[in-house]
């Protein structure tokens, strides 16, 4: 899969044109995968590559930060999942005020037609685009007739009466229903990132942790979990993780802290994927570090029981 970073690199787009879909693809859940499977069929019929157009940041994150939903996937993981789905190209557009000011007509004639040479387009029938959200599905249908590309609206993917959507995944996570979230996603929910130096508080109380900052992201989950850590060897490593602000030590920024069970290694600079397996408890504030230490010991015991591990002598 080829990643095209920004509209200034559109010369890297396929010269023969493409079949295209546009969206956030947050989580790359089973509904997204069904859409991409259909897009691949259209690509095969036309002998054209499949392209996904994404926006970074997502539009709501620019215009209404307080209303923007928690992200299920960072860009790096999103790209990995899209590659697994057989996508040929991803155009990652920097969504800023300048791009947002692009008229709907220019979005169609300049971006879709002139540079991407789109031959087939799949978007939701509620898709809006262009300055002031002036462009809609009806305008795209008219443009398709004028410029010679086919357009279809993406159907909501349902199973057993359950709508599969990023919103439904977030709700399952908010309800601590990891099994439902995994069923909707088609893969376990995980948080990924690079391990950075922390204040080493965990080390001083006997529970060294790998710290992964969540940056500007709002996490869809909070609390303490039994986890499996990928990216440190052939097998997943069991651990216990806290996702939150660490209120006991007056923390402010959200971060992910992982304590590996029975493994000691230097993780600084390593990129890890932390798969949530079981919710142990909500994050809470303790009156002292001794209370915190005692609770972490109980959390570790709960995680060990979940993984069927005995405590080393």
Curated annotation (Swiss-Prot):
Assigned EC number: 2.7.1.26, 2.7.7.2
Keywords linked to the UniProt accession: ATP-binding, FAD, Flavoprotein, FMN, Kinase, Multifunctional enzyme, Nucleotide-binding, Nucleotidyltransferase, Transferase
CDD domains in the record: FAD_synthetase_N
Family: Belongs to the RibF family.
Record's protein name: Bifunctional riboflavin kinase/FMN adenylyltransferase
InterPro entries assigned: FAD_synthase (IPR015864), Riboflavin_kinase (IPR023468), Riboflavin_kinase_bac (IPR002606), Riboflavin_kinase_bac/euk (IPR015865), Riboflavin_kinase_dom_sf (IPR023465), Rossmann-like_a/b/a_fold (IPR014729)
Organism field: Escherichia coli (strain K12)
Ranges that cross the membrane: none
GO molecular function: ATP binding; FMN adenylyltransferase activity; riboflavin kinase activity
